[in-house]
Amino acid sequence: MKKLTVARLGRTVGLHGDMKLHILTDFPEQFQKGSTFESDRGSLTIESVNPARGTVKFQGIDSVDEAKKYTNAYLYSDEETTKKSFPLGEDEYFWFDILGCDVFEEGKRLGKVVDIQRLPAGDYLLVETDKSFVDMKKAKSFLIPFLDMFIEDVHLDQKRIDTKGAQDILEAS
């Protein structure tokens, strides 16, 4: 089961073990009293959370010294839990499902999605270009806006994304 990074713990706040919570997910509602997360330093169960202040307190961590041991620790969920807890609508996808998909246009493989970059204008797929295009001196990677005008179809069962206009972006890169 693959771990998904959902948050990073920051500095301590106050005297009772509260910590800054830096949320790294599109689903902040998962941070509720009683929720348990794995961290790179052990399991942590939320005792309280204050979204307005961006802080969290965990059960059994009641002092600044105890909390400092978790500064910069990452909190993890997993794909299965995320899919169960947060059902998506039509034409909505989890990033972890999109990563690793092959990108095609008119039957030609353009490359593979290796990352998703969130930019002010929207989400972009970072595509590692197929060797056949790199051999023709094209860019080793390029960005495709995740918009209807470029994305024709997403076939998660085949790990395949069909595009239109993406080859033009590659050619211009």
UniProtKB/Swiss-Prot annotation:
The keyword rRNA processing applies. InterPro entries: PRC_barrel-like_sf, PRC_RimM, RimM, RimM_N, RimM_N_sf, Transl_B-barrel_sf. One of its GO terms (molecular function) is ribosome binding. Its main location: cytoplasm. One of its GO terms (cellular component) is ribosome. It is found in: Cytoplasm. Residues 90-169 form the PRC barrel domain. One of its GO terms (biological process) is ribosomal small subunit biogenesis. Keywords: Chaperone, Cytoplasm, Ribosome biogenesis, rRNA processing. SUPFAM superfamilies: PRC-barrel domain (SSF50346), Translation proteins (SSF50447). The keyword Transcription does not apply. Belongs to the RimM family. Binds ribosomal protein uS19. The PRC barrel domain binds ribosomal protein uS19. An accessory protein needed during the final step in the assembly of 30S ribosomal subunit, possibly for assembly of the head region. Essential for efficient processing of 16S rRNA. May be needed both before and after RbfA during the maturation of 16S rRNA. It has affinity for free ribosomal 30S subunits but not for 70S ribosomes. This is Ribosome maturation factor RimM. It comes from Nitratiruptor sp. (strain SB155-2). The lineage of its organism: Bacteria, Pseudomonadati, Campylobacterota, Epsilonproteobacteria, Nautiliales.
